[in-house]
From Swiss-Prot:
<dbReference type="InterPro" id="IPR004087">
    <property type="entry name" value="KH_dom"/>
</dbReference>
<dbReference type="Pfam" id="PF00575">
    <property type="entry name" value="S1"/>
</dbReference>
<keyword id="KW-0694">RNA-binding</keyword>
<comment type="function">
    <text>Involved in mRNA degradation. Catalyzes the phosphorolysis of single-stranded polyribonucleotides processively in the 3'- to 5'-direction.</text>
</comment>
<dbReference type="InterPro" id="IPR036345">
    <property type="entry name" value="ExoRNase_PH_dom2_sf"/>
</dbReference>
<dbReference type="InterPro" id="IPR015847">
    <property type="entry name" value="ExoRNase_PH_dom2"/>
</dbReference>
<dbReference type="Pfam" id="PF03725">
    <property type="entry name" value="RNase_PH_C"/>
</dbReference>
<dbReference type="InterPro" id="IPR012340">
    <property type="entry name" value="NA-bd_OB-fold"/>
</dbReference>
<feature type="binding site">
    <location>
        <position position="499"/>
    </location>
    <ligand>
        <name>Mg(2+)</name>
    </ligand>
</feature>
<dbReference type="GO" id="GO:0005829">
    <property type="term" value="C:cytosol"/>
</dbReference>
<keyword id="KW-0460">Magnesium</keyword>
<dbReference type="InterPro" id="IPR020568">
    <property type="entry name" value="Ribosomal_Su5_D2-typ_SF"/>
</dbReference>
<dbReference type="GO" id="GO:0000287">
    <property type="term" value="F:magnesium ion binding"/>
</dbReference>
<comment type="similarity">
    <text>Belongs to the polyribonucleotide nucleotidyltransferase family.</text>
</comment>
<dbReference type="InterPro" id="IPR001247">
    <property type="entry name" value="ExoRNase_PH_dom1"/>
</dbReference>
<dbReference type="InterPro" id="IPR004088">
    <property type="entry name" value="KH_dom_type_1"/>
</dbReference>
<dbReference type="GO" id="GO:0000175">
    <property type="term" value="F:3'-5'-RNA exonuclease activity"/>
</dbReference>
Length: 718
């Protein structure tokens, strides 16, 4: 008899067999599920605190996705030989899992919940992100926590005009789309994607296809819960304090309405702070007069937020102007300036309303590419995009330092949007880094980074295939009434039911990200939203094209220039030299950066054209092949009794035998040659070991016959 109550569910999912199991591993967690997809195995665990901390006014959910190197049969690098802080990839997948789970916890549930997913085994062809998301959903479902799931997820590719479910990594190389969709049985909750300029119809079709195909995973989780689920928690939301709600509404509603008539963000924020403070103070006075305890500020703040949301949502659904006075379809005023920083390779200042990004592009060589030591294998990243948003961007003080999860996520979204329109490495051999510094923020800063990033790249001379613009959209839904908002503000993001970001060109979409906070948003609503987003994107693209028609044809004076030459791959070791001595001397003496690929392509980069020319000349000399019948100007290196060693090319010596020096018999070689003497010689033979035989006599004879190219200054008796 076993000590485990192990429950296993298996199902065929597209081209993969999936196995879910619970009851054997991590039994002390609130919920734990193993997911196995063709040897990619993840362990997802959930622990929920039984009570909320006193005064807690938000839901403390943390999701950590962790890759273990043993999963791929590797030992970690570094001094300690163990895993360190999460990589960028792990952070992005943690966010990917968090986003569809968070809205499914009930309002008012403030108990701490921690979701931890470990990758235990990795099939390099099967990415672990979808199994991890399925596992996290299943672990929450079996835990009994108050969770309105389960959630399913799927990856969708678009290959040869057909959707493909959960493609392998090799298949993804052929795909024009990489789309991840997560949702419940009834609704889509999250979309994350990048595409090769696809139409809105194809993108929406991928979302619908993924939602349909994930249902089998949701059904399997239901089966797992029926047999292995723990009892549901007896949790009930706190009863609404109707007297408090009525009193706060009485005290604050008129002032909140007045605050939302202020179009300027700073003035509006200041007014809202005044209303919050005045309301709390008045409630404290009421409590003191009545001999009771006043409601805590968190509770009062939640009531005020609900009133704010109702005001803004009602105004918009009734067709009244938005917070800043716009209608639902208008994009905020746009200002564009390029070349703003004198010593950078490319720069742009993109301002849209109260959101502003200063974006800088830097060009580098192959040696500047980022080495990624991923679980599935090492690779190099030629294009990097980093997003930073310091606290001053919103007029606040706060922590400054390493990027937070949000900054990493926004940077990746902007990178995905631009990647489809970058030239290939063959077309433009530079590595590229784009940094977006958000200097003002009031909504849609990641999309400002896309617009500014495209402009900075063009300013740097990167031949982009097309202009790329991005726009953030919002949606408010009440019953049968809904409104789609173009170019949302920060406040509209918080108060709406869906926010989604669309980036692309005139031809199509390159990136799409959706986060849906409620159930009930239909395909038809998403269709309307995408069509309105396209309208906004086209408006921004027209502004960008007017400001910058195309990429600069001349690089910055401070950007490196590059030339490439092809050498025999067998000569690579000669250019590198023993311990790197030759290439090190080359780079130091010519002031260049030299990269050599395995196929013999040598890339020379420098801000000095003279240095590049010198480096090229030296490399060509080093790699010249000795050809039989060719005449060389050589230098005598060493005299021997039977001949001389003559250097004819850098690193290439040959034997000039005593019988090949002159037509007459030579008794003493010193009568004809001396160390360091310049001598013209002809290559008469090479062998498989690379040994070279030379002749000066052959040139004397050619000269005697009147042949062209007769040697000059041939060796003569001393």
């Amino acid at each position: 008899m076993t000590m485990f109550n192990k429950i296993v569910k298996e199902f065929q999912w597209g081209q993969h067999k999936v196995r879910l199991e619970t009851g054997e591993i991590a039994r002390q967690a609130s919920g734990a599920v193993i997911v196995d997809v063709e040897d990619t195995v993840v362990l997802a665990t959930v622990v929920g605190a039984k009570t909320a901390k006193p005064g807690q006014d938000f839901f403390p959910l943390t999701v950590d996705y962790l890759e273990k190197t043993y999963a791929a049969g590797k030992i970690p690098g570094g001094f300690f030989r163990r895993e360190g802080r999460p990589s960028e990839g792990e952070t992005l997948i943690s966010r990917l899992i968090d986003r569809p789970l968070r809205p499914l916890f009930p309002e008012g549930f403030y108990n701490e919940v921690q979701v931890v997913i470990h990758v235990l085994s990795l099939n390099p062809e099967i990415p672990a992100d979808i199994p991890a998301l399925i596992g996290a959903s299943a672990a929450l479902a079996v835990s009994g926590l108050p969770f309105n799931g389960p959630v399913g997820a799927a990856r969708v590719a678009y290959i040869n005009n057909e959707y493909v479910l959960n493609p392998t990594r090799p298949q993804m190389k052929e795909s024009a789309l990489d789309l991840i969709v997560a949702g419940t049985e009834r609704a889509v909750l999250m979309v994350e994607s990048e595409a090769q300029q696809l139409s809105e119809e194809v993108m929406l079709g991928g979302v619908v296809f993924g939602h349909e195909q994930m249902q089998i995973a949701i059904d399997a989780i239901h089966d797992l819960v029926r047999e292995g689920g723990k009892p549901e928690w007896d949790w009930q939301p706190a009863a609404k304090n109707e007297p408090l709600i009525a009193r706060v509404t009485e005290l604050a509603q008129a002032d909140l309405l007045a605050a939302y008539q202020l179009r300027d963000k700073q003035a509006r924020s200041a007014k809202l702070k005044e209303v919050y403070a005045a309301t709390s103070k008045k409630l404290e006075e009421d409590a003191a007069a009545g001999g009771t305890v006043a409601a805590d500020k968190a509770t009062v703040g939640n009531v005020l937020f609900d009133i704010e949301a109702k005001i803004v949502r009602t105004q918009i659904l009734n067709g009244e102007p938005r917070i800043d006075g716009r209608d639902t379809r208008t994009v905020r005023p746009i200002e564009i300036r390029t070349g703003v920083l004198p010593r950078t390779h490319g720069s742009a200042l993109f301002t849209r309303g109260e959101t502003q990004a200063m974006v800088v592009a830097t060009l580098g060589t192959k040696g500047d590419e980022q080495n990624i030591d991923a679980l599935e294998g090492e690779y190099r990243e030629r294009f990097m995009l980093h997003y930073n948003m310091p606290p001053f961007a919103t007029g606040e003080t706060g922590r400054v330092g390493s990027p937070k999860r949000r900054e990493i996520g926004h940077g990746r979204l902007a990178k995905r949007a631009l990647a489809a329109c970058l030239p290939s490495a063959d077309e433009f051999g530079y590595s590229i880094r784009v940094v977006s510094e958000i200097t003002e923020s009031n909504g849609s800063s990641s999309m400002a980074s896309v617009c500014g990033g495209c402009l900075a790249l063009m300013d740097a001379g990167v031949p982009m295939k097309a202009h790329v613009a991005g726009i953030a959209m919002g949606l408010i839904l009440e019953g049968n009434k809904f409104a789609v908002l173009t170019d949302i503000l920060g406040d509209e993001d918080h108060l709406g039911d869906m926010d989604f970001k669309v980036a692309g060109t005139e031809q199509g979409v390159t990136a799409l990200q959706m986060d849906i906070k409620i159930q009930g948003i239909t395909k038809e609503i998403m269709q309307v939203a995408l069509a309105q987003a396209k309208e906004g994107r086209m408006h921004i693209l027209s502004k960008m094209t007017s400001a910058v028609s195309g990429a600069n044809t001349v690089l910055s004076d401070y950007a490196p220039r590059m030339i490439t030459i092809k050498i025999n791959p067998e000569k690579i070791r000669d250019v590198i030299g023993k311990g790197g001595s030759v290439i090190r001397a080359l780079t130091e003496e010519t002031g260049t950066t030299i990269d050599i690929s395995d196929d013999g392509v040598v890339t020379i980069a420098s801000t000095s054209s003279e240095g590049m020319a010198e480096a090229k000349k030296r490399i060509e000399n080093i790699t010249l092949e000795v050809e039989v019948g060719q005449v060389y100007e050589g230098t005598v290196l060493k005299l021997l009794d039977f001949g001389a060693i003559v250097n004819i090319l850098p690193g290439k010596d040959g034997l000039l035998h005593i019988s090949e020096i002159a037509n007459e018999r030579i008794k003493d070689i010193n009568d004809y040659l001396k160390d360091g003497q310049q001598v013209k010689v002809k290559v008469i033979q090479t062998d498989e070991k690379g040994r070279v035989r030379l002749s000066a006599k052959a040139l004397l004879n050619e000269g005697a016959n009147g042949a062209s190219g007769a040697p000059q200054g041939e060796p003569t008796p001393q």
